[in-house]
Amino acid sequence: MATTILAFDFGTYSIGCAVGQSITKTAQSLTAFKSQDGIPNWQHIEKIIKEWQPDLLVVGLPLNMDGSEQPLTQRARKFANRLNGRFNLPVALQDERLTTTEAKSEIFSRGGYKALKKDKIDTISACLILESWFDNNP
């Protein structure tokens, strides 16, 4: 049975979003939500959840390279808990180390320096988080 999954790249100013299917194990970038100090416009997130009707939400967990937590880690956990509480959907956390670096590299290779826009980086990062989740959950 196909499962639709939405992934989020949490940030204090922008939250990238991507969608994917368990059958194809591919992700497609959707949008980046503006946030103020990590607080998103919940109505925008609700709209995308209603549109895609996901079975699962995945939130990228920012960790240091050695696997230890950083200040943003707890904020991402809080965001994940709020998603679960508001929308009553299961939420999984996925290690997101190096996704922003990989996203920048991918965007730069396609369009050079001028293509490196923050919202594009965040949505590609959300895709990479979801693809990583697929790789770890066959």
Swiss-Prot record:
Keyword Nuclease among record annotations: yes
SUPFAM superfamilies: Ribonuclease H-like (SSF53098)
Assigned EC number: 3.1.-.-
InterPro entries in the record: RNaseH-like_sf, YqgF, YqgF/RNaseH-like_dom, YqgF/RNaseH-like_dom_sf
Sample GO molecular function, one term: nuclease activity
Location in or out of the cell: Cytoplasm
Keywords: Cytoplasm, Hydrolase, Nuclease, Ribosome biogenesis
Pfam families reported for this sequence: RuvX (PF03652)
Family statement drawn from the similarity comment of this UniProt entry: Belongs to the YqgF nuclease family.
Function: Could be a nuclease involved in processing of the 5'-end of pre-16S rRNA.
Name of this protein: Putative pre-16S rRNA nuclease
Origin species: Haemophilus ducreyi (strain 35000HP / ATCC 700724)
